[in-house]
């Protein structure tokens, strides 16, 4: 979480100013799930281990975190790929593993940076349907994208130009 010069920034009632790196990492791990455009999977860990990683940092036992990771892989349609390494997966499969990893710690907010940027159109629709389903279950989702079809699948579109909000409009709310 970045520092700031003016104003007040809170996360779930916690003032985010002068936090230690450890406390900031704890808050990030508990409150925010990240989906990266480049997936950021750990190359020497299989799908289950990649998905289970946030739970490791929360002190969850290996047996429990691996069982939960399998559930989340099943949720994204990849249970059969649990033991596969990232280099054995397609871009869409890697992205779904990354989504499962972002969701497993049950964060309150998901920050998704170009979550469909590396995907074909069919997989883009599948990923957006999954994100929409999770959003409808009550999870706040912030998606950064340059793809008009992805933006329009959201409830609200905030267009930013040169670091400033240019417009706020209603999205279609479906893929």
What are these regions (language model features)?
Residues 1-160:
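ABC family nucleotide-binding domain
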Residues 172-175:
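ABC ATPase nucleotide-binding domains
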Residues 157-170:
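H-loop (His-switch) and adjacent beta-strand-loop-beta switch element
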């Amino acid at each position: 979480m970045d520092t700031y010069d003016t104003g007040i920034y809170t996360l779930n009632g916690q003032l985010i100013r002068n936090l230690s790196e450890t406390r900031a990492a704890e808050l990030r791990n508990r409150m925010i799930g990240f989906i990266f455009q480049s997936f950021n999977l750990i190359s020497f860990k299989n799908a289950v281990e990649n998905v289970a990683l946030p739970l490791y940092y929360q002190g969850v036992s290996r047996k429990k975190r691996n069982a939960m990771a399998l559930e989340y892989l099943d949720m994204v349609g990849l249970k059969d790929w649990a033991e596969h390494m990232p280099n054995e997966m397609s871009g869409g499969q890697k992205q779904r593993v990354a989504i499962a990893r972002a969701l497993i710690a049950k964060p309150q907010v998901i920050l998704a940076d170009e979550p469909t940027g590396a995907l074909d159109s069919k997989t883009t629709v599948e990923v957006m349907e999954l994100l929409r389903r999770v959003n409808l279950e009550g999870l706040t989702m912030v998606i950064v994208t340059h793809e008009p079809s992805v933006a329009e699948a959201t409830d609200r579109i905030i267009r930013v130009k040169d670091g400033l909000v240019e417009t706020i409009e209603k999205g279609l709310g479906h893929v």
